Swiss-Prot record:
It is found in: Nucleus. Residues 63-124 are annotated as: Disordered. Keywords: Isopeptide bond, Nucleus, Phosphoprotein, Repeat, Ubl conjugation. The gene is CBX1. PROSITE patterns: CHROMO_1, CHROMO_2. The record marks 16, 125-126, 135, 146, 167-168, 170 as: Interacts with the PxVxL motif of TRIM28/TIF1B. Not phosphorylated. Ubiquitinated. InterPro entries: Chromo-like_dom_sf, Chromo/chromo_shadow_dom, Chromo_dom_subgr, Chromo_domain, Chromo_shadow_dom, Chromodomain_CS, Heterochromatin_chromo-domain. This is Chromobox protein homolog 1. It comes from Homo sapiens. One of its GO terms (cellular component) is nucleoplasm. Residues 21-79, 117-175 form the Chromo domain. One of its GO terms (biological process) is DNA damage response. The record marks 23, 40, 42, 58, 60 as: Histone H3A7 binding.
Length: 185
């Protein structure tokens, strides 16, 4: 597999002396030994080169958020069409019927602040759904959820501030005093 370099990451790559692959799309999610992993489609590579990667190694919060949002939308569609699908699945064997039940139970568990967990940090942000959402990592959990920014601003303002502070960049410009010092020399 050849290596591709994201131009936005050039500075980081030079510091780490390591090239980064560019994620095209997040395809799936799983939990292995308590760690969340995502199945990734790599830009410029075929589907044969898709790989499962641990969440902590990834730097694509927008793509993860987009994937989680699409899963949420797909689940809501499944609920509205649930009756029709069951009638059509009479010919399926029992092993296959139990899989959707497990997935349904898993996705009906509380998400976001409804889980009652304490926020640890914000991994990323997206507005792909038309509303600003944060990808929130929870303390004592390997899972992350999309939560509305409005809700996070009220329930954990310090976590939100930390997220923005981590991303602040300061640009220093020469002041007039510096210019005068240069003229005297």
């Amino acid at each position: 597999m050849g290596k591709k370099q994201n131009k936005k990451k050039v500075e980081e790559v030079l510091e780490e002396e390591e090239e980064e692959y560019v994620v095209e799309k997040v395809l799936d999610r799983r939990v292995v030994k308590g760690k969340v992993e995502y199945l990734l489609k790599w830009k410029g590579f075929s589907d044969e080169d898709n790989t499962w990667e641990p969440e902590e190694n990834l730097d694509c919060p927008d793509l993860i958020a987009e994937f989680l949002q699409s899963q949420k939308t797909a689940h809501e569609t499944d609920k509205s069409e649930g009756g029709k699908r069951k009638a059509d699945s009479d010919s399926e064997d029992k092993g296959e019927e139990s899989k959707p039940k497990k997935k349904k139970e898993e996705s009906e568990k509380p998400r976001g602040f409804a889980r009652g967990l304490e926020p640890e940090r914000i991994i990323g942000a997206t507005d792909s759904s038309g509303e600003l959402m944060f990808l929130m990592k929870w303390k004592n959990s390997d899972e992350a959820d999309l939560v509305p920014a409005k809700e996070a601003n009220v329930k954990c303002p310090q976590v939100v501030i930390s997220f923005y502070e981590e991303r602040l960049t300061w640009h220093s410009y020469p002041s007039e005093d510096d210019d005068k010092k240069d003229d005297k020399n």
